[in-house]
């Protein structure tokens, strides 16, 4: 072997047969060819060089080197099939027999969907295939009228189809949606009630998801967690709203019970509709001017709403009528002052009757009651007063006929400003046989001097 790159070709060419013993002829032939190409003398030309010179130069490398035994390894001269087949060991399905029996190839952990579960995880449910859904379809065909399985039936179907309970419920929801779209089949409330009676786990799910898109059975387990969180929050809000509404109903019921007294519980609705206004005036007692005791006010049959327009347009004679002043001495001491009456009306003065209002010093307590305006007065109270005025006027006419001969009693009667109002009243309120005598006596006894004194007494007060 020659090493021209090292610069020692002449020392290795001499005695090559002796050095290497002719064990590797291929190597020697290659060395001779390299020396001829380089233009250097071969071993035959340098035969005169002794072997001692080579030994002295090489030193420890002059001893022959015996090649070890490489029989355990693959020979270099043969073609190695390992390198040509390195890329095919990953194509297990196409070339299953590329490796020899003695070659141990690394096997990758391959899992095939031939078993019960996929990917070797027993916790992962099986996908919805035709074999698994055929059982669900058979059940659905048998229960077309009520396609809502109970919880027990869903558990049974889940065991048979090796699916989860959520997947079975979702499959039935999708199937009902498809039936509605294809055949436009609608199921009544009976099916839903039966489903709720037996405790189905998707109560409210079919009503909520019937019109939505179909749900993927693969991701239903993950989506169910999010839906449960949303449903719990919605249920809490609904419970708070129902509790608030229930509290409002209870408070309204208590208020209505407080407003209606217990004594009015047996009355009809039309009497209860009057409310608190009727309860204030239903027990009002009116004292007669003759002092004959208290008279219970008759109940008003029909309520009437008083308004400002009605009060302004009503005639004065219908609103007030006064008894004669001669009844001042016979009034009962139980008559209260007008300010202490139950209905707090407004005391107003009509402009057309201003001179009557200014002559208030000549009025009695009963006439002051008649001067009150009906503005703001309870309708029952006003009706009772009108009835009282009618009775008092009839009694006053009877008493006036008995005392008609006494001019002293008639003189203060003429000085009262309310006497002129009584003259304007219609004559139908008093008995017809008493009017001519009362009118005749009054006209005969009235003189010019008394009229003059009446006018003079009215002027200073005006």
Curated annotation (Swiss-Prot):
Domain of life (superkingdom): Eukaryota
DNA-binding region: 121-183
Region: Disordered, residue numbers: 191-302, 314-339, 405-462
Gene Ontology BP annotations: brain development; cell development; cell fate specification; dorsal/ventral pattern formation; maintenance of kidney identity; mesoderm development; midbrain-hindbrain boundary development; negative regulation of BMP signaling pathway
Chain intervals with Polar residues compositional bias: 446-455
Main location: nucleus
Pfam families, sorted: Homeobox_KN (PF05920)
Biased composition (Acidic residues): 210-220, 228-239
Cellular component annotations (GO), alphabetically ordered: nucleus
Cellular localisation: Nucleus
Alphabetical keyword list: Activator, Developmental protein, Differentiation, DNA-binding, Homeobox, Neurogenesis, Nucleus, Repressor, Transcription, Transcription regulation
Biased composition (Basic and acidic residues): 240-257, 410-426
Function: Acts partially redundantly with other irx members in neural patterning. Required for formation of the posterior forebrain, midbrain, hindbrain, and to a lesser extent, spinal cord. Acts early in neural plate development to induce expression of some but not all proneural genes, and specify a neural precursor state. Also up-regulates repressors that prevent neuronal differentiation. Patterns the neuroectoderm in both the anterior/posterior and dorsal/ventral axes.
Similarity comment text for this entry: Belongs to the TALE/IRO homeobox family.
Name the record gives this protein: Iroquois-class homeodomain protein irx-1-B
Organism of derivation: Xenopus laevis (African clawed frog)
Taxonomy of the source species: Eukaryota, Metazoa, Chordata, Craniata, Vertebrata
């Amino acid at each position: 072997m020659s090493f021209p790159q090292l610069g020692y070709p002449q020392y290795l060419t001499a005695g090559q047969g002796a050095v290497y013993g002719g064990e590797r002829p291929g190597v020697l032939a290659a060395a001779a060819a390299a020396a001829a190409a380089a233009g250097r003398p071969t071993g035959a030309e340098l035969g005169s060089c002794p072997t001692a010179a080579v030994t002295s130069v090489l030193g420890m490398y002059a001893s022959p080197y015996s090649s070890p035994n490489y029989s355990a390894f693959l020979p270099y001269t043969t073609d190695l099939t390992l390198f040509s087949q390195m890329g095919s060991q990953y194509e297990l399905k196409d070339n299953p027999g590329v490796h020899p029996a003695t070659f141990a190839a690394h096997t990758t952990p391959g899992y095939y969907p031939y078993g019960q579960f996929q990917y070797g995880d027993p916790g992962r449910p099986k996908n919805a295939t035709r074999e698994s859904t055929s059982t669900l379809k058979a059940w659905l065909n048998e229960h077309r009228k009520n396609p809502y399985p109970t919880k027990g039936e869903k558990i049974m179907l889940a065991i048979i189809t090796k699916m989860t309970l959520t997947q079975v419920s979702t499959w039935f929801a999708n199937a009902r949606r498809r039936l509605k779209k294809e055949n436009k089949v609608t199921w009544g409330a009976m099916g839903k009630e039966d489903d709720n009676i037996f405790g189905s786990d998707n109560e409210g799910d079919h009503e909520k998801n019937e019109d939505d898109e179909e749900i993927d059975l693969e991701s239903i387990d993950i989506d169910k967690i999010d839906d449960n969180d949303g449903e719990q929050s919605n249920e809490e809000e609904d419970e708070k709203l129902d509790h608030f509404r229930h509290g409002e109903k209870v408070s309204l019921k208590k208020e209505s019970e407080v407003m209606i007294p217990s004594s009015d519980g047996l009355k009809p609705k039309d009497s209860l509709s009057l409310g608190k206004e009727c309860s204030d005036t239903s027990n009002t007692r009116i004292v007669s001017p003759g002092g004959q005791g208290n008279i219970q006010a008759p109940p008003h049959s029909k309520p009437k709403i008083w308004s400002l327009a009605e009060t302004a347009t009503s005639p004065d004679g219908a609103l007030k009528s006064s008894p004669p002043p001669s009844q001042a001495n016979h009034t009962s001491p139980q008559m209260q002052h007008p300010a202490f009456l139950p209905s707090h009306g407004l005391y107003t003065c009509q402009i057309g009757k201003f001179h009557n209002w200014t002559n208030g010093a000549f009025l009695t307590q009963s006439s002051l009651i008649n001067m009150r305006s009906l503005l703001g007065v309870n309708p029952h109270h006003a009706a009772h007063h009108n009835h009282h005025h009618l009775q008092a006027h009839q009694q006053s006419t009877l008493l006036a006929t008995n005392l008609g001969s006494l001019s002293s009693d008639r003189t203060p009667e003429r000085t009262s400003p309310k006497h002129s109002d009584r003259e304007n009243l219609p004559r139908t309120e008093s008995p017809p046989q008493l009017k001519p005598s009362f009118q005749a006596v009054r006209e005969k006894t009235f003189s010019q001097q008394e009229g003059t004194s009446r006018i003079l007494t009215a002027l200073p007060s005006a």
